[in-house]
Amino acid sequence: MFTRNKKKRIFAAILIIGDEILSGRTQDTNTSFLAKWLNERGVQLKEVRIIPDKLNTIVHSVNLLRKKYNYLFTTGGIGPTHDDITAFAISKAFKKKYEYNKEAYQILERHYKDSYFNEARKKMAKMPRGAGLIYNPSSSAAGFYVKNVFTLPGVPSILQSMMSFVEQLIIGGEKVYSVTVQVHLPESKIGKDLGKLQKKFKDLSLGSYPFFQSGKIGTALVVRGYSEKRIQECKIILEKILKKIKKS
């Protein structure tokens, strides 16, 4: 069951692993999904990195990010091919033996009982010693977790199907609130006043995002923070500022 510590602020990072992402051959959609998923559970995504399938790079990145944030989610590199080295790299990062996980092996063995259970398929059961399994309802290959590092597949549909289990393993934090104000004004006319408002509300995050709608240029202004009251105070002032700009 998912639990939340409403008084604690929780932060996370995502490490996307794969040459295919860096080359542009495969488009990453996991970041958007995970960002929304985490935010809904009171976990703020603070950093996203995309790195190649290089052992030393993965080890270095995992060790850096797992110490910096409450949670680290890795995606990609746990399949059956020669360049799927994420599980081995995480074993190195934690200085744990890279070996077959008995339960993961048995799940794969049952799944492939009517076909050839070859070495490539067996490889998907290898992970750091003592790792916990992240069960996979879409296929037989499990993900795994070691301490605060959650290792997931790169295929979006499979990753998404596994998050209901991940939810039971994490503790959410203080809820982040947000409000959006849309206005048919370009960012250039708002920027100066928005900067002044941000200085006044240092405990909030103010962002501006341009859009083009019905032949008109506009800006979506998003106010985010932990205090719903402060957000509403900021919104009232923001709307007054925008009204004044539109009249000028």
What are these regions (language model features)?
Residues 148-241:
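An accessory alpha-helical subdomain
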Residues 17-19, 74-82, 224-226:
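Glycine-rich beta-strand-to-loop/alpha-helix junction loops that act as flexible
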Residues 5-48, 53, 229-232:
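Glycine-rich phosphate/diphosphate-binding loop of Rossmann-like nucleotide-binding domains
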